[in-house]
Every structure is written in C-alpha cells, then in structure tokens.
C-alpha cells in the first residue's frame, strides 16, 4: 500500500491555495503555494496518507481531518486542534481518512492494518448497519462510491478483481479474470 506523504493541497474556505506538509521531525506546517510558512505545530507520528477538508461545525469554516496511529485529528487553519478531537478508533489505521459527502453531512472511511475498510460517521463511530469490507488480497486503496438511480454502490478494484458492494458494505458482485474492471 502506497501511503501519500504530501504536501496536501488545502483549497476550501479561502482565496489562496495552501498546503499542509509534514516535516522530517513530524511537525505539521501550513504553507502558501510559494513556500512561505504560515505556521508550524508539533506532531509526533506520520500521517496516514490523506488530509481531507470538512466543515465539521457546519459554519462554512473548513478544518483539516487526518489520521495517525488509531486516531483522527481535526485541525483548523490557524493551527489549533478543534474539539472534540482527537478521536480514537478501535484499530490501527493503515490509510485514510477518505471523506464521502452526502446530504450535507459526511462519512469517513479508513483502511485498517487488518485489511478492513470501515465506515465511520462524523463523530468517528462505526456507521450503524455497516459491514466491514475485506478481501483475501491486500486492499490498496479506497472504493469509488457510484450512484445508479436512487441506489449507491461501492466499487473496489484490487490487483485481481473488481468487487461491488451495497452502500451498507454487503458484497453483491465479484468480477475477476477477463471480466474485472481494473
């Protein structure tokens, strides 16, 4: 699994593009596109591959959501952690978070080190009715959420096959060999 290391583009809620980067000593730094620093804060561990922008408080002020270890963090653009974060989940995070927006809210998907994709609500609680997605081969990325009519499906591509799941995580299709949509 390739873990992106950034810098991570930050665009929502401001006129000028910025990047959040993790420095060699694990500090987090927000910079302008020309490299000028805005701030830097201490951090103790590597990020797990993505920084997503969310409007957690529904006030049109976006925060940066990211993961490390078994925790999710929410950082505002002034470099302050915002409550009620950090939030712990039950197992180590290999890759994430990946945010899926819907109906003015969002869900958070994480790939855990036990090769399971799990969906969480905005408060980092497992989504009720969700069935973890797991495969025999290593999951290397997040599924695509596809809407067909009124239904939504997760399309997960692995090196060997294409798997289709209901929005709840229930597996309904397995395309392998020459039928795989890789």
For the regions a protein language model found, what residue spans apply to each?
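Trp/Gly-enriched beta-strand/coil motifs that build multi-repeat beta-propeller-like domains
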Residues: 60, 84-85, 105, 112-114, ...
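Beta-strand-rich domains and repeat architectures in extracellular enzymes and scaffolds
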Residues: 2-26
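Short loop/turn segments that connect beta-strands within beta-propeller blades
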Residues: 32-34, 76-80, 121-125, 166-170
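Acidic, glycine-anchored loop motifs typical of Ca2+
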Residues: 10-17, 56-63, 100-107, 146-153
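Repeated scaffold domains used in trafficking and secretory/extracellular systems
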Residues: 2-9, 45-55, 90-100, 136-147, ...
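Aromatic (tryptophan-biased) beta-strands that constitute blades/sheets of beta-rich domains
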Residues: 1-3, 36-43, 82-91, 126-135, ...
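Conserved beta-strand element within WD40/beta-propeller blades
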Residues: 19-22, 64-67, 108-111, 154-157
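Loop/turn residues immediately N-terminal
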Residues: 24-29, 69-73, 113-118, 159-163
